[in-house]
Amino acid sequence: MIFRSRWNTALLFLFLTSLLMSAQEMPKAPQAQVFTLTPEPGFFTEPGVAVNPQNPQQVVAVFQDNVHAGYSQDAGHTWTVAENVDPKNFRISGDVSTAFDNQGHAFVCYIAFDQLGSFNYWAHGATRNGIFIRRSLDGGKTWEADHIPVAEQPSEPGIPFEDKPYIVADNSKSKYAGNLYVGWTRWRIADSQMVLSRSIDDGKTWSKPLEIDAHPGLPRDDNGAAEGFSGVVGPDGKLYAIWSQDDDIMFTTSSDGGQTFSHARAAIHTAPIMFAIDTLERANGFPQIAIDPKSKRLYVSWSDYRNGDLDIFLSTSDDGGKRWSEPTRVNNDPVHNGAEQFFQWLAVDPVDGSVNVLFYDRRGDPKNQKQIVALARSTDGGKTFANYAWTDNAFEAGGVFFGDYTGLAAYAGRVYGVWMEKPPGQETANEKSAEEKTDATNSGATNKEKKPKPPGTVVKVGTADFSNPSGNQALGAK
């Protein structure tokens, strides 16, 4: 009887395990392709991607260390990395974002500086720095020589540090069509400000930065500061903007082309946006905002750990942001299963209205250390989501900096994602420490011969095609 009971228990365990594994499996994204933009690992992080609405064959993907830009002229089937995009008169550049305007011109926006201030307290000891843009008139192949300043700070004591810009293009049919907006965090000694500058001449000149909101208190990443600007323009030219502050997503609008803004208010309450994840140096849940230009429905996505582990959430508004829906969980693995989903990015397809979310997903690793890249898609206005695997091979992120975000764009059923991966065979921080101890003890001759490559990241861009109605079916999220 004891043997039979144990045997039945074992069978039950195997049965439940198989059910759990099948529930965690995701179908492959339809017609998925993945390309590596950086063949050799480096400090490549924080990418972005945009599709030219005037010529959807043109796609630009940007990333840092320093500023780099890849481009495709055939809707993502082939990719090339452009040369000499980064500014040469600054030591460091990054925090890139990209957009196409209504003339089909591509823009890359970035910060540039010579040396960071104190870690997490970026305004303390800041050196000359600024926010700049650069233009491409041929879909990303070549970039104009001018690095146009949006805001600059000279090398003087007590200067602010301009950080994490995001560029938005007005591609509506309104009287503000063609406007460009850049929002960012201005770190000062005593507070953090959310500021915005606009251009009405195709990015050639920029307005004096306008303060949208300010957060008093010690301006640090881990102190609830105003950080992580995201913006979108509606079909009537209205600009909607969000960012993280304390445990809330802040929201404001401009109805006059970025000249004035409504009073910023907390629109969506979340858990803190900064959190620790096993094997990752740091992570956050910065939000993004998008709009369906046909229905005018607004969407906001973010990640937080209200369920005990990190999940991706989405909320919608049908009244211009006055009221927001209860959050919908985007990832469809079992709730409270301990698997982390993080570094999401949101894109709404302006043609078919689908809602697309890219994220890293650890549901397939019982140790919750390795992730694949997943894509969630909703065709019912964000009520439910199908989940797809964009990549097959899980990777872990130990010992490398993964930055703060990924990137996503969608147009006419084609979806473009850009992200970072750590290639296999690299040492982690713990492995490096253990190896150094062995080298010190045994002179290191054998170990040095077998020493793996130093840790680093590569940037990959993925495509998926939902325009074919016979594409794969995926499990729905509730």
Language model features by range: what are they?
Residues 9-19:
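Bacterial N-terminal signal peptides
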